[in-house]
Amino acid sequence: MRSNLLLPEIIMLASFLMGLVGGQRAMTPLAAVAIAAARDELPADNGAPKLLSHPVVAAGALALAIGEMAGDKQKTAPDRIVAIGLAARFVTSAIAGASLVPRRQRWIGAAVGGLTAVAASYPGWRARMAAMSQYGQTPTGFVEDAVVLGGAAAIARNAAKLGAA
């Protein structure tokens, strides 16, 4: 039997993990929760903005995530730690973090998701730079994409289970 004392921490785990994803790809957390919202797969009484569940919003977020992943392989792609990149990671991961927790905890979930994304950007950037020097930009980008996509999908898919814990 699970203790109710740990329930808030378990629920915030999804926001934290999605923030880790957001530190690597800004648009993936938003796309993951928008798709989950459109499929009605988010936890009951979640903190997601209602507009997020609209199929057009989900499709748009997915298109932006795909565009970001394609652009990341370009030599001219900016580092994730530039100011606009950090701001985008904070905002999209905050929306995702709020969407993965009960409505009454949405502000905490937003803070956890957004702040984690900004913090995770730096070690993610350093790891990518180190890997790129050995393996190149495109191969390391594809590996990072696979990890990010798998993580985001697993988090969004299991958030409802965490909320029902």
Question: Residues of each region from the PLM?
Answer:
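Short amphipathic, positively biased membrane-proximal segments
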Residues: 1-165
